UniProtKB/Swiss-Prot annotation:
PROSITE patterns noted in UniProt: RIBOSOMAL_S12
Complex and partners: Part of the 30S ribosomal subunit. Contacts proteins S8 and S17. May interact with IF1 in the 30S initiation complex.
Region (Disordered): 1-28, 104-125
Protein name: Small ribosomal subunit protein uS12
Organism annotation: Prochlorococcus marinus subsp. pastoris (strain CCMP1986 / NIES-2087 / MED4)
Length: 125
């Protein structure tokens, strides 16, 4: 605990918070180009082939981003929009690709949580 005299000499240092998504540079989303689209295996105890993409962002960073939903149309040179948000069982994956924007198609036949996967309302015939 500093004394009053010490506080007069120099003020308290402000604590700086470290961001969880530095590549976004304080923006809600960032555009980027896929450099590689591949699958990755999660940490123990989970088992799957998670779809991920390596993306070069307009901010100059190259990051790994998760492709949510079932099935996707992404390939190399696809232009995508990224948001923050990590995938707990994939180390190093701190971003999500936003479905239904730019070159990323929405999830087909999605009926619930449609807005999160860029799916249009189903036609009721």
């Amino acid at each position: 605990m500093p004394t009053i005299s010490q506080l007069i000499g120099s003020e308290r240092k402000r604590l700086t918070r470290k961001t969880k998504s530095p590549a976004l540079k304080s923006c809600p989303e960032r555009r980027g180009v896929c450099t590689r689209v591949y699958t990755s295996t999660p940490k123990k105890p989970n088992s799957a082939l998670r779809k991920v993409a390596r993306v070069r962002l307009t901010s100059g960073f190259e990051v790994t981003a998760y492709i949510p939903g079932i099935g996707h149309n992404l390939q190399e040179h696809s232009v995508v929009l990224l948001r923050g948000g990590r995938v707990k069982d994939l180390p190093g994956v701190r971003y999500h690709i936003i479905r239904g924007t730019l070159d990323t198609a929405g999830v087909k036949d999605r009926r619930q949580s449609r807005s999160k996967y860029g799916a249009k309302a189903p036609k009721n015939d």
